[in-house]
Amino acid sequence: MILTGRWVLCIGSPETHRNSVFEAKGFRYVTHNKSLKGFYWATYLLFSRLPRSFLMAAKPTLLPALICSLVVSVSQYGFAAEVPEGFQVIFNGTDLTGWHGMPHFDPRDLAKMTPENRTKKIAEWTEDAKQHWSVENEELVNDGHGAYLATDGEYTDYELLIDYKTVALADSGIYLKANPQVQIWDYTEEAKFNIGADKGSGGLWNNSPGAAGKDPSELADKPFGEWNSFRIRQIGARTSVWLNGKHVVDNAIMENYFDRENPLFAKGPICLQTHGGEIRWRNIYLREIPAEEADKILTESHADGFESKFNGTDLTGWSGASDNYEVVDGAIRCKASHGGILHTTDEYANFVVRLEFNVPPSGNNGLAIRTDGKGDAAYAAMCELQVLDSEHQNYAKLDARQYHGSAYGMAAAKRGFLRPANTWNFQEVTVDGSKIKVELNGNIILNTDLATVTEYLANSPHPGKSRPSGFFGFAGHNDPVSFRNISIKRLPDTPAP
């Protein structure tokens, strides 16, 4: 509904009219009504930009023609249709609310600042950004200069929808968790063919040479002057990119540009880069991905060759301390005040295991790798990968090699990627020769060669670390830790170089 001092134009159901107007100084004004969608929303946007004097002077007979002309204008201005289900609008089409300036800057340095200095620095960047960013016709426009634009919100697992349009010779990108970047550039610029411009936009360009995702799988850019559409999904560091409907990056790890020895930051803002040429953005929506959906995506990605090892009903296919474990709600759970090793009946040399686990507050368990089912898995097996509620106060003073994901007593995993207690987590473990890699919720937290380890916790020997094969299992430590969706993929007996 559009109201002026004289005319009322109904463009939706009565429900959409609520809170559509307010009165001030004798005039009625259209206000932002988030319930207006599609054609109604576009018409509202267009009418709200017409001079009030024009609307007040308009005759009823002119309004139908006016509406027709506005409908035609919708396609020219590119106003968004309905917000996709489950997504939130993170650019309001009017101003820079929800965004701040931020150049290419190591987020760790920002985090080290005092709150006062951090606020001051962001304010400086934002003032710079305001000189180069503007809003035109619901489009976010940058002139090719100034600070980047970053969301005020920070995100962990999410899906981003965003359209862009740029010009020849421009170079831009989208930083994810403040980390560069999903690349945008001129795919016709021959001077940059040597660094991959001819392959097109959408790749994780700052990944190491040869790394998965560095280059897009195909050229998907539209010609200059046309809008391009990105769909970007990130779970931990696992990143997928669709450009104009083409899947150009498939669940690749985005490397931490600022510290390649560490995983990508656990959370961070989305940043729109400016790099020497005008670029326009519109239709920016974001959906945070819940843990259960994130785990399902990670489980189903590149799942060829995996064999389920748990039927969800009983302990068929498992041996060892079976009296100390139970099946509850489709998961294997260690009984409280019980322990021991529950292991597969099959042996494995090199393999990948995927599973989900749930740790109660202060809970402790472990993954027994190449175990013989006897003794203490931390020493008698190749290793015990710690399963622990690491952030519980009981464990504040542990050795770094005792926290979750660590090869117990030998190699420390990175911290900060475990979900809260009583929440399911996804974990993938790759065992290849003496090398072992642990990926937690899409983040690689351990990647080491145990053959190179020479220092041990408390100088305790680990005679089992050179075992070439054995069972896979769970090393219970008296806490009701649960495991489900367990699958294993065999790898060639000869380790990869």
Where do the protein language model's features map onto the residues?
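Charged/polar low-complexity intrinsically disordered segments
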Residues: 2, 15-18, 37
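Basic polycationic patches enriched in arginine
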Residues: 6, 18, 28, 49-52
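Intrinsically disordered, low-complexity segments enriched in serine/proline and basic residues
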Residues: 30-31, 42-43
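Bacterial N-terminal signal peptides that target proteins for export
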Residues: 39, 46-65
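Bacterial N-terminal signal peptides
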Residues: 64-73
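Carbohydrate-interacting regions of secretory-pathway proteins
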Residues: 78-497
